[in-house]
């Protein structure tokens, strides 16, 4: 299946896909509720008007809510200068980043794309690594991806000493109460991946530290506002902005938490779910991570002229993950047995 991003981001589309599937192989077929001819005739005519009215009511409600919040907590006004300064600092940090390092991942893009996906890795093992290392699931997976990209470059005889590349990572900004809403509601952060670090343990620690710093910064919210702003500007302005920020990174990386239970489609068991993140801003590589039913899969999409063999990256990811597990979890269990 192929969806346009205007329908929704990864979180929203995951919800849509989930609703199209069943949790049992023999789920009953739900028949659509019939509509009267009157509804059928007036629906398309009234829908734009109703949508406009609902949007106006929501905007008014938001404004009233914000006004009441300031009346209840006037001290929040004192925080506005600090918040503005923090946002400006986050934006200037990205704008002042030097152009991305020249690697085989960057270059002139063509039309043809290549895709690959890894064998699933157990989510429980990812969590075990994180528990021992004091890291999040996302930190563990990103560290394994960094190791895989490092291994790929070494395989192409590219010098990786001291090398770092940046990844643009979408961050879901929906509150839990609106987790099932359609639309795009994400910000962006720029993460530097330490490809020049040979030790997988040190690499994980560095990724963890950098992700924690990004979570404390307003960068994701700042870029959410920028995405909305540039989306309303002329196409030429929007394209220049996208290219500017695209020059600061090598890849788009996203992690979507999928369904935790076994799903079925038309009575057939779904063994795995995978997607490939769309690329923009002249970025030649997209890396997507999807969890489903206790397993995690890595997907890679690349420009065929730059990386014609993305399966080498997915294979390296599997290897790097097992190295992390053996070095961190197995070693920890060995130390416990010895004591």
List the model feature ranges, each with a label.
Residues 1-283, 287-339:
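Soluble acyl-CoA-dependent acyltransferase catalytic core bearing the H(X)4D motif
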């Amino acid at each position: 299946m192929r969806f346009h991003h205007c329908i929704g981001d990864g979180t929203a589309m995951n919800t849509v896909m989930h609703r199209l599937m069943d949790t049992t192989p023999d789920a009953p077929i739900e028949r659509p509720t019939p509509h009267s001819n009157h509804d059928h005739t007036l629906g398309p005519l009234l829908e734009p008007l109703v949508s406009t009215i609902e949007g106006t009511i929501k905007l008014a409600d938001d404004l009233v809510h914000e006004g009441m919040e300031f009346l209840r907590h006037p001290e929040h006004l004192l925080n506005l200068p600090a918040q503005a300064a923090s946002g400006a600092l986050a934006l200037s940090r990205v704008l002042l980043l030097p152009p991305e390092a020249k690697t085989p991942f960057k270059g002139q893009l063509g039309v043809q794309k290549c895709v690959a996906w890894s064998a699933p890795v157990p989510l429980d093992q990812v969590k075990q690594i994180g528990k021992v290392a004091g890291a999040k699931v996302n930190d563990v997976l990103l560290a394994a991806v960094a190791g895989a990209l490092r291994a790929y470059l070494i395989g192409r005889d590219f010098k990786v000493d001291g090398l770092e590349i940046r990844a643009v990572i979408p961050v879901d900004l929906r509150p839990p109460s609106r987790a099932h809403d359609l639309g795009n509601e994400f910000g962006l952060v720029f993460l530097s991946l330490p490809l020049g670090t040979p030790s997988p343990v040190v690499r994980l620690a560095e990724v963890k530290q950098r992700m924690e710093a990004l979570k404390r910064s307003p960068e994701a919210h700042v870029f959410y506002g920028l995405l909305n702003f540039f989306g309303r500007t002329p196409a030429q302005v929007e394209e220049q902005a996208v290219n500017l920020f695209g020059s600061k990174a090598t890849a788009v990386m996203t992690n979507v938490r999928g369904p935790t239970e076994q799903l079925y489609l038309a009575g057939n068991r779904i063994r795995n779910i995978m997607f490939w993140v769309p690329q923009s801003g002249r970025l030649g590589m997209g890396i997507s991570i999807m969890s489903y039913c206790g397993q995690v899969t890595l997907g890679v999409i690349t420009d065929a002229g730059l990386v014609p063999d993305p399966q080498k990256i997915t294979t390296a990811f599997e290897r790097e993950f097992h190295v992390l597990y053996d070095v961190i979890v197995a070693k920890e269990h060995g130390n416990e047995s010895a004591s």
